[in-house]
From Swiss-Prot:
Major subcellular location class: cytoplasm
Protein name from the UniProt record: Profilin-2
Gene: Pfn2
GO molecular function, one term: actin monomer binding
Keyword set, alphabetical order: Acetylation, Actin-binding, Cytoplasm, Cytoskeleton
Role, per record: Binds to actin and affects the structure of the cytoskeleton. At high concentrations, profilin prevents the polymerization of actin, whereas it enhances it at low concentrations. By binding to PIP2, it inhibits the formation of IP3 and DG.
Length: 140
């Protein structure tokens, strides 16, 4: 799915993100394109199911993983009409910094963006939302 890499490149171009990904969540449940060498490159179908699944409460208590990286869910509006986003924060393991992550849901794909250190989640949410809306309006 080489054509999807341009969407990842577009998400990365302003310099506030350290990685981005486009991930299918319907019939093609895998990473379609991602920043090379990043955590998102390793997102699994099980992790995708956790994000889009019917249980919208369990991950608030237990957290979730993205590419085996432990994360906390801050806000879940993935299935709220007009929003379709989720705000996540990575957990520190061994004292490394934590990072904000935003997920936007289109019709068949999820848009993931992870900010650099100190990048506020609100800007990431807007970026994920805008790309997901564009893809949703384009039939994806």
């Amino acid at each position: 799915m080489a054509g999807w890499q341009s969407y990842v490149d577009n998400l990365m171009c302003d310099g506030c993100c350290q990685e981005a990904a486009i991930v299918g969540y319907c019939d093609a449940k895998y990473v379609w394109a991602a920043t090379a060498g990043g955590v998102f490159q390793s997102i699994t179908p099980v992790e995708i199911d956790m994000i889009v699944g019917k249980d919208r409460e369990g991950f608030f208590t237990n957290g979730l993983t993205l590419g085996a990286k432990k994360c906390s869910v801050i806000r879940d509006s993935l299935y709220v009409d007009g929003d379709c986003t989720m705000d996540i924060r990575t957990k520190s393991q061994g004292g490394e910094p934590t990072y904000n992550v935003a997920v936007g849901r289109a019709g068949r794909v999820l848009v993931f963006v992870m900010g650099k250190e100190g990048v506020h989640g609100g800007g990431l949410n807007k970026k994920a939302y805008s790309m997901a809306k564009y893809l949703r309006d384009s039939g994806f």
